[in-house]
Amino acid sequence: MEQRSPRLRWLVVWVVAVVWMGAVLARLSYLQLFCYSEYFAKAQHQQQRVFEISPMRGVIYDRKGRELAISIPMDSVFADPVDVKDPEMVARLLSRALNLPAEELETKIREASKPVRLAKKLSPETVERIDDMNLKGVFFEKENRRVYPQHELLAHVLGWVDVDEKGMGGIEHELDKWIRGRPGRVMVMADGKRRFYDRREAAADPGAGVVLTIDETIQYIAEKELALTMQQSHAHTGTVVIQDPSNGALLAVATAPAFDPNDYGKYSDDDRMDRAVTAAYEPGSTFKIITMAGALEDGVTNPDELVDCQEGSILVAGRLIHDHKPFGILSVRDVLAQSSDVGTIKIALKLGAPRFYDTMRDFGIGQLTGVELPGENRGLLRPLENWTPSSIGSLAIGQEVSVTPVQIISAISAIANGGTLYPPRIVQEIRGGTPIALPPRGEPKQATDSKTAATLREMMESVVLEGTGKKAKLNGYTAAGKSGTAQKIDPNTGRYSPNQYFASFAGIAPVNEPAVTILVVFDSPVGQHFGGDTGGPVFERIAEQVLAYLDVAHDVPTQPNTQTTKNNPGQPNPNNARAAAETANTENEARFQAAVAQKNPDAQSSAPTVAFGEEDAVTVPDMSGQTVRGVIEGVVIDQAKAAVASASLTESDASFAALLC
């Protein structure tokens, strides 16, 4: 036994060693085969620091290349929890500079396992204060801030972005996948003692630029006149849409109340709503143009046919409908000019429900237009089988149907261009490193024939010369149009309100070679609520300024004493609008870039904005940093303030500098 004892001991040792080595090998095999990814990731986490580089969003331009939305690189502050030895002290010091609770900052640092962002997009002054503290583990990385240099101008169309640079409205949202770009990455390598020894960077790809069909100068004119009438009429909301009838391009889309996308959080969802595409309304008498189009094209009437308007009332399937005033015998031309409901209904009854329904569909009613803006409303046109016996009477005068401003302006443009319904468009081009295809668009279609369109333009000219649209008459240009005054549905009763209206005016100018179509809509104006009284003067002021800016030749003699217009004695004649606007673009670009460079030498942009001055000249101050309403109150109403053309830029530059902060 004593001789076998050493052997046994060696055997035991050998067995234990084999088992131990087997266990080690098994464990190593397990870790290698089943836990490799987990431990490799942990090692990378200890050795690497990865930061995402936010891409530069693409610039949004107007049709002439003027910048409407830009991005500016700014510093964000980060803290590395490994290098911050005293989170409490660091948080206390940073809280003073960042104006954030120290407890919140300390919690962020203590709970982080990798570098954590403490605050985004700081002003240069704040960055300098923090940099002077020389805090170990605190560093800066560049991130981009979206800036809208014109503030309220075109805000509803442009939209806005959230704190993470994601498009949240308008073009920013609709074309976000093109505009936002692709993030980059920065990877920093560290050794076992947390000493950084290598840095690798994958650059961010900037987003594509977007060129809109909007003309910034025309947009300014539209917003200026819209805001002025909103102030005078105390309407709830207002919309102006201006279109090129030859191709469907939208030249201006203005909505009130306005909002500033640089500070979008201050405004309600209603304020940020683009009513031109999302808010459907009953059009009232502007819809009579479509009723007439169907009847004229089918040959059931002609402009000179006489209609008995029955002294102002008609019974349709048991429903009594009253005119706004009693009429006797009127020609079809005068039925439209005087906006007789009874006469229009009788014409629709001759046309018949099936053909009338087809006409409305031909003009795009009840259908999406496909305009490149989010949240488009198709409006309401019930299928023919769902009509009641009295529906044709209601539809003929723009009731029991709802439309968006973009739908109506497109229908009016079809009359203007000879009968072709072009899908409205607001995106002209997407600019990238390689050619980028535009989102799919609908095809133009024939809404009516050219003869009917020409007849309707002549009838609509009578509305302006002799009918309900006299206040829309232009100086030096022919104009055709149609007013609309539609009762609103009272949500409490489900019936038409006796004192709440949509007042609108849709117009074409000039008549024979139309350059623009313009739609003006006001929701619940106080006092004068008829479309011709409220919308007509706005059409007149906008059309005269826009046609002059576009260098459209006069097609009728101008009247003497043209320094002021008849509907707004304080409003100047814009004969030199084009030259002044072009001069403004050059001057304001240099001024705006100087203001940006003062805060951030890497960022450049332009902010041309036009304001109309006194008499027959157009004066152009730098209005960046001011609201449209502020411009109106301080410049437009009082002609005597011509000195605004040479106003100091101090306030404007200070406003933009404050924006960067």
Predicted regions and their residues:
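Periplasmic/cell-envelope proteins involved in peptidoglycan metabolism and beta-lactam response
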Residues: 1-264, 280, 352-366, 375, ...
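Beta-lactam-recognizing serine transpeptidase/beta-lactamase-like catalytic domain environment
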Residues: 69, 189-201, 214, 240-285, ...
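Residue-level marker for well-ordered alpha-helical positions
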Residues: 124, 224, 289-292, 354, ...
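Short loop/edge segments at beta-strand edges and connector loops
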Residues: 142, 481, 653
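A generic alpha-helix signature
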Residues: 217-221, 447, 451, 455, ...
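Residues within well-formed alpha-helices
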Residues: 221, 290-294, 334, 410, ...
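Ligand-recognition elements built from short beta-strands and adjacent flexible loops
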Residues: 476, 541-661
